[in-house]
């Protein structure tokens, strides 16, 4: 606020806290949006007790959602379109707004014709739809690191309130899956080969068998 300028080459930003309601949510517990308690919080009856981050932050009269939305608008103005918004799947802000798959996947022509603007013409933004089209929130963190910021970006682009963007569904192992789904799964050879890297994303891990070989450069 003083106008002082500091020379630096890297800025690390961690803004606010978000209640960890995933397990309560996956068990079918009700939730409500409470900006003074950090965002979505459980709203179950007295027969269920919750302690810690899953119960929400202590209400202090501070509007956490408005604060984070202001930060997101400011960051969007000063950051490059190539800024990563989903670290696990390497989805950039441009990919999200353009509704494009991450760079490690092919981008067919029909996908290039779509964008968030065209989707908004069909209806309000939906995180689960965006997940399927861009893989934002589909990584091993199950959207824990990016779910709220993706919802904020969608709300800003749509010109709507944060709470109007549906809360994204959870992924396994938070979401229970019947064993028969895993037992009957038919994996291709290419899929089996991909399990030794970070969910098959070449730029994030180098398979042990490729270290010290010409194929190692393919993962850089």
What name fits each language-model region?
Residues 149-150, 182-220:
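Short flanking/linker segments adjacent to small metal-binding domains or redox-active Cys/His motifs
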Residues 1-134, 138-140, 144-186, 190, ...:
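Residues forming the flavin
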């Amino acid at each position: 606020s003083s106008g002082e300028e500091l020379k630096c080459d890297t800025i690390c930003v961690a803004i606010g806290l978000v209640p960890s309601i995933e397990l309560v949510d996956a068990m079918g517990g009700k939730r409500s949006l409470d900006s003074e308690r950090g965002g979505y919080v459980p709203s179950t009856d007295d027969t269920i007790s919750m302690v810690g981050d899953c119960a929400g932050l202590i209400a202090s009269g501070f509007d956490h959602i408005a604060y984070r939305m202001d930060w997101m608008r400011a960051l969007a103005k000063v950051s490059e379109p190539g800024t990563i918004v989903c670290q696990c799947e390497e989805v950039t802000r441009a990919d999200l707004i353009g509704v494009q798959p991450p760079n490690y996947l092919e981008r067919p022509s029909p996908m290039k014709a779509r964008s968030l603007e065209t989707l908004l013409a069909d209806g309000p933004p939906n995180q689960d739809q965006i997940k399927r089209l861009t893989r934002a929130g589909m990584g091993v963190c199950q959207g824990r690191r990016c779910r709220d910021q993706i919802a904020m970006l969608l709300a800003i682009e749509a010109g709507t309130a944060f709470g109007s963007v549906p809360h994204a569904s959870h992924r396994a192992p938070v979401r229970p899956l019947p064993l028969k789904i895993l037992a009957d799964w038919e994996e291709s050879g290419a899929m089996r080969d991909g399990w030794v890297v970070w969910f098959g994303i070449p730029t994030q891990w180098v398979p042990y068998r490729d270290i010290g070989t010409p194929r190692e450069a393919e993962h850089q």
